[in-house]
Amino acid sequence: MAKAVTVKIKLVSTADTGYFYVTKKNSRTQTEKLSFKKYDPVARKHVEFKEAKIK
């Protein structure tokens, strides 16, 4: 059986609120860590979210 190309990752808020998004990424084409500006409802503003592993 082949190894899965897409991997589930967690985008964690840099505002230290504990809020996170779960998304998928293609590990072959996107080798660098993802970083997005998304809405954090706990902080009630747009902040940067950085990639972390799902445990």
Swiss-Prot record:
Family annotation (Pfam families): Ribosomal_L33 (PF00471)
GO cellular component: cytosolic large ribosomal subunit
Gene Ontology biological process terms from the UniProt entry: translation
This protein's UniProt keywords: Ribonucleoprotein, Ribosomal protein
Residues of the signal peptide: none
InterPro entries: Ribosomal_bL33, Ribosomal_bL33_CS, Ribosomal_bL33_sf, Ribosomal_zn-bd
Any GO MF annotation of the entry: structural constituent of ribosome
Key word Ribonucleoprotein present: yes
Family: Belongs to the bacterial ribosomal protein bL33 family.
Name assigned to this protein: Large ribosomal subunit protein bL33
Organism: Methylobacterium nodulans (strain LMG 21967 / CNCM I-2342 / ORS 2060)
